[in-house]
């Protein structure tokens, strides 16, 4: 064999079998950075149609987690695939840099502003801390293979962005959407600040649930409304609440106007009294009050009690009964304790009736000094004291511990309160913002489509947006308010532009350093500067304007796509929609795509306490970023995304199949020069033309899946192609031709040409997902080429050519099925030790007329398809008793060990081996390939 070994075309490549990704990827990243890869991509797309994916900014605090990785990888896949489709698709990453979490971190280090450090110095410390966090997160994102303008990202704390945020606010004001009001807002007593809807999480909490009696100021008159005359016992309305601490702020009792209410009399502890309860809740209420027998004295609609007065249970005033649409009979008594300073519904109905918006609670959650009974007590600690006082006043009918879902601060994880404070709001209904936003939602494509109904419900129900915060580190609300009238300065918009110009040069500190007289002159004494800062959701929500509209690489093009986790319907998607609609009357995006949260193999959230956290840094250091990227792409992101060590190991297995395919392709392109060796598709061997045709069809399916953001379909189709059409069929069949045919002959060059075309296409298919591996493949592909695959477009060399004489795709599919059946029988013969390898086998196929016609069409080349030394086709009726039935009714098989000698070069067993004098150990085909013009292949 030593004489003939060098006549074989053995595969050879520098592409290693093992990826060693954890070590090799950082080396590639260095080259990408050194070569300015991102700028090369930008230069390659000058003048092309833009596609703008706007990066929702992660918060600049802490290390990135697996959810961050999912988000950034999905964005990167889209950017790279859009670039492959010819778009100019810049990616400018961003960070959200203001707000409380950073303040808290800096406070731990230097103390609170105004104590050991000035507010100005505190802001500078916050800026430094945020910059450090950005640098750490940036390195982790780059390690994932995400390409972008990492050296010039947008930060909401950039002076230019801060200035543009102020300009965005001025446009909202100019459009008439801003107003100031005393309204109940979510308030965190730990933060000492209002919270946005998106900063509120709901967790279970145990609260005291109490039923409280409000005795009528005139019981006889109230009883009369039920048709009971001259009633002599006390009549009370009963409320049910889980926030006893709000009772000092009670200013009314709300009833539903069309609901039926009963007057129920009973005796307890020797005292006769009558209670007013919703008719449908009488039984459940009296059970709670341990009332064994009662009499219903009458019934009346809620509307009958409008403005009837009832005594507060422990304060020296009475309150009216009022009517509200928010009253339900889901729980409680059908009568709602109404404190306009502590609830949104309460506030709305209170405005209708002109009720006082009482707020006896300070910023820190402690009752103010003038609060009767409870001054100086924290509201949650005061609950027990309120209950005790009600019991003392004989107003408490029931008291139990009640477990329910309750709003918590997303940062402190502590319960929050509703508290009326003077704040700045974007009105949802003045100038039709809510209505227009709902119209814009309809014009936007939501992926998955359930996102539309989700955000619609949120917009329909959301209150006015409180955009002011009482914080130090944030973009200031740069307004001047008249000290007497509380009205905005009439030139607010132009003044804000002048302030924005200063911020552009000096940052937000310019506002606090500003002497009002510099802008207002003699008017300065009439006005005061607003010291509130903007909700950070306004910062990020205005970046479509403050960043996208401002940066040159976006060419003034609107945003095509927002892509974030599903929690952002109420977060960034919402804030961006509101600001854009308020500013421009339209949504800031055309498409909105959401992905699910990551959970472990048991469906649980990632939690340090559970110990199921999978850090992306650990994955890249152990398996490599391409494995993580493949997991992201292969997972249907429309629901929860399950990840575990086992799942990532499965991704690594899938990766190896793709890598092995790429290695086979490269190894068999050794010595192939496309410029001189490429065989035209129409001149190829039929099997080669078929596989190119299959690849061309697959490419269209892959491109379509990329365009629809169905990356799991891309990976499914890629794996199917690598495993079935290539791995189990085509690549197996061509090995013989590739290794043994004449090196320069048509049979081999046809095969190599097909492999080359597939390689050129496949390296592009995988580039958006397996970016590092694609680059590795690209560097080793033969032929002249640009430095990087990422500047390319989808390969145009895949021609779907079908000649008149060609065999159909169905034919090759049938042949694949037959081959699988043959393999089963050969495998059994191998287990029975009747043969060794498949080339020791002679197979006889007993087939019906239709299948016989197909199998004999390719003549002697059938044996190459079946990987046997001989293949005979005989009529099914002639099947011998030893013939094995197959899953095809039209086919039976007999496998026998060949009696012919084995060719030393190709290992086929052929009758002529030993008959050729010059080459006694070779078959005729090998002699032709060594000394002649090379064998001729038509089909396989």
UniProtKB/Swiss-Prot annotation:
Gene Ontology terms: cellular component: cytosol
Cofactor(s) it depends on: Zn(2+)
UniProt keyword terms in alphabetical order: Aminoacyl-tRNA synthetase, ATP-binding, Cytoplasm, Ligase, Metal-binding, Nucleotide-binding, Protein biosynthesis, Zinc
Motif 'KMSKS' region, chain ranges: 605-609
Keyword field contains rRNA-binding: no
PROSITE patterns with a match to the protein in the record: AA_TRNA_LIGASE_I
Catalytically driven reaction(s): tRNA(Ile) + L-isoleucine + ATP = L-isoleucyl-tRNA(Ile) + AMP + diphosphate
GO MF term list: aminoacyl-tRNA deacylase activity; ATP binding; isoleucine-tRNA ligase activity; tRNA binding; zinc ion binding
Cofactor note: Binds 1 zinc ion per subunit.
Amino-acid positions noted as binding ATP in the UniProt annotation, renumbered to this chain: 608
Binding site for L-isoleucyl-5'-AMP: 564
Keyword field contains Magnesium: no
GO terms classed as biological process: isoleucyl-tRNA aminoacylation
Annotated Zn(2+) binding sites: 903, 906, 923, 926
Motif stretch ('HIGH' region): 58-68
Subunit structure: Monomer.
Family: Belongs to the class-I aminoacyl-tRNA synthetase family. IleS type 1 subfamily.
Domain topic, free-text comment: IleRS has two distinct active sites: one for aminoacylation and one for editing. The misactivated valine is translocated from the active site to the editing site, which sterically excludes the correctly activated isoleucine. The single editing site contains two valyl binding pockets, one specific for each substrate (Val-AMP or Val-tRNA(Ile)).
Annotated function: Catalyzes the attachment of isoleucine to tRNA(Ile). As IleRS can inadvertently accommodate and process structurally similar amino acids such as valine, to avoid such errors it has two additional distinct tRNA(Ile)-dependent editing activities. One activity is designated as 'pretransfer' editing and involves the hydrolysis of activated Val-AMP. The other activity is designated 'posttransfer' editing and involves deacylation of mischarged Val-tRNA(Ile).
Protein name as it appears in the record: Isoleucine--tRNA ligase
Source species of the chain: Shewanella baltica (strain OS195)
Source species taxonomy: Bacteria, Pseudomonadati, Pseudomonadota, Gammaproteobacteria, Alteromonadales
């Amino acid at each position: 064999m030593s004489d003939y070994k060098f006549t074989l075309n053995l595969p050879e490549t520098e592409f290693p079998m093992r990826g060693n990704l954890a070590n090799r990827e950082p080396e590639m990243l260095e080259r990408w950075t050194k070569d300015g890869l991102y700028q090369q991509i930008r230069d390659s797309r000058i003048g092309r149609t833009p596609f703008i994916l706007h990066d929702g900014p992660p918060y600049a605090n802490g290390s990135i987690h697996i959810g961050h990785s999912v988000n950034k990888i999905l964005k990167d896949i889209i950017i790279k695939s859009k670039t492959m489709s010819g778009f100019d698709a810049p990616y400018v990453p961003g960070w959200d840099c203001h707000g409380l979490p950073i303040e808290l971190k800096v406070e731990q280090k230097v103390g609170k502003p105004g104590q050991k450090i000035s507010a100005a110095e505190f802001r500078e410390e916050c800026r430094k801390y945020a910059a450090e966090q950005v640098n750490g997160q940036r390195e982790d994102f780059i390690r994932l293979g995400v390409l972008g303008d990492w050296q010039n990202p947008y930060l909401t704390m950039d002076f230019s962005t801060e200035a543009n945020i102020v300009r965005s606010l001025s446009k909202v004001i100019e459009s008439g959407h801003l107003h100031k009001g005393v309204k109940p807002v979510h308030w965190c007593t730990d933060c000492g600040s209002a919270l946005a809807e998106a900063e509120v999480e709901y967790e279970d909490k145990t609260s005291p649930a109490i039923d409280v009696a409000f005795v009528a100021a005139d019981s006889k008159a109230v009883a009369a409304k039920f048709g009971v005359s001259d009633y002599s016992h006390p009549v009370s309305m009963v409320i049910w609440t889980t926030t006893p601490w709000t009772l000092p702020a009670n200013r009314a009792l709300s009833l539903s106007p069309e609901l039926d209410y009963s007057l129920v009399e009973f005796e307890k502890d020797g005292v006769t009294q009558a209670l007013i309860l919703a008719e449908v809740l009488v039984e459940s209420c009296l059970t709670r009050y341990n009332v064994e027998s009662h009499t219903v004295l009458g019934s009346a609609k809620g509307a009958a009690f409008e403005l009837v007065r009832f005594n507060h249970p422990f304060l020296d005033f009475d309150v009216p009964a009022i009517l509200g649409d928010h009253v339900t009979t889901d729980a409680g008594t059908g009568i709602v304790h109404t404190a306009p300073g502590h609830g949104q519904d309460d506030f709305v109905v209170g405005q209708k009736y002109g009720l006082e918006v009482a707020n006896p609670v300070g910023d820190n959650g402690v009752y103010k000094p003038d609060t009767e009974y409870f001054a100086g007590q924290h509201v949650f600690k005061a609950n027990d004291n309120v209950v005790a006082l009600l019991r003392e006043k004989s107003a408490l009918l029931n008291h139990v511990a009640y477990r329910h879902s309750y709003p918590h601060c997303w940062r402190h994880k502590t319960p929050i309160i509703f508290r009326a404070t003077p704040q700045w709001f974007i009105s949802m209904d003045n100038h039709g913002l809510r209505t227009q936003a709902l119209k814009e939602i309809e014009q936007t494509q939501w992926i998955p489509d359930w996102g539309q109904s989700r955000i619609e419900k949120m917009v329909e129900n959301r209150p006015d947006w409180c955009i002011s915060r009482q914080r130090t580190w944030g973009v200031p609300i740069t307004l001047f308010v008249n000290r007497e009238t509380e009205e905005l300065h009439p030139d607010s918009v132009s003044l804000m532009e002048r302030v924005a110009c200063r911020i552009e040069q000096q940052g937000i500190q310019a506002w606090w350093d500003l002497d009002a007289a510099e802008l207002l002159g003699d008017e300065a004494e009439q006005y005061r500067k607003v010291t509130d800062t903007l909700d950070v959701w306004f910062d990020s929500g205005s970046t479509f304007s403050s960043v996208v509209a401002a940066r040159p690489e976006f060419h003034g093009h609107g945003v095509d796509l927002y892509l974030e986790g599903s929690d952002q319907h109420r977060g960034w998607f919402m804030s961006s929609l509101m600001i854009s609609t308020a500013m421009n009357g339209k949504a800031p995006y055309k498409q909105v795509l959401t992905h699910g949260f990551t959970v472990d193999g048991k469906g649980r959230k990632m939690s340090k306490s559970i110990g199921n956290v999978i850090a992306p840094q650990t994955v890249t250091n152990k398996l490599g970023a391409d494995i993580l990227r493949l997991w992201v792409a292969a997972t249907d992101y429309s629901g929860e995304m399950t990840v575990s060590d086992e799942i990532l190991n499965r991704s690594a297995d899938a990766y190896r199949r793709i890598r092995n395919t790429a290695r086979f392709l490269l190894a068999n392109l050794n010595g192939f020069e496309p410029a001189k060796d490429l065989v035209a598709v129409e001149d190829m061997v039929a099997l080669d033309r078929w596989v190119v045709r299959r690849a061309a069809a697959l490419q269209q399916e892959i491109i379509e899946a990329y365009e629809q953001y169905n990356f799991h379909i891309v990976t499914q189709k890629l794996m199917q192609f690598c495993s079935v059409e290539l791995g189990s069929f085509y690549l197996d069949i061509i090995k013989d031709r590739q290794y043994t045919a004449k090196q320069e002959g048509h049979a081999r060059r046809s095969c190599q040409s097909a492999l080359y075309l597939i390689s050129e296409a496949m390296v592009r298919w995988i580039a958006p997902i397996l970016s590092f591996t694609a680059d590795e493949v690209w560097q080793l592909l033969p032929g002249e080429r640009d430095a990087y695959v990422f500047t390319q477009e989808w390969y145009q060399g895949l021609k779907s050519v079908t000649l008149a004489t060609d065999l159909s795709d169905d034919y090759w599919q049938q042949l694949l099925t037959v081959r699988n059946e043959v393999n089963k029988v050969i495998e059994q013969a191998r287990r029975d030790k009747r043969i060794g390898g498949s080339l020791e086998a002679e197979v006889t196929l007993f087939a019906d007329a239709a299948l016989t016609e197909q199998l004999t069409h390719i003549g002697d080349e059938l044996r190459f398809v079946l990987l046997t030394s001989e293949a005979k086709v005989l009529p099914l009726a002639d099947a011998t008793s030893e013939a094995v039935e197959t899953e095809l009714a039209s086919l039976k098989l007999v496998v026998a060990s060949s009696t012919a000698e084995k060719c030393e070069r190709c290992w086929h067993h052929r009758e002529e081996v030993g008959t050729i004098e010059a080459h006694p150990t070779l078959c005729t085909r090998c002699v032709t390939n060594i000394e002649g013009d090379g064998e001729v292949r038509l089909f396989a």
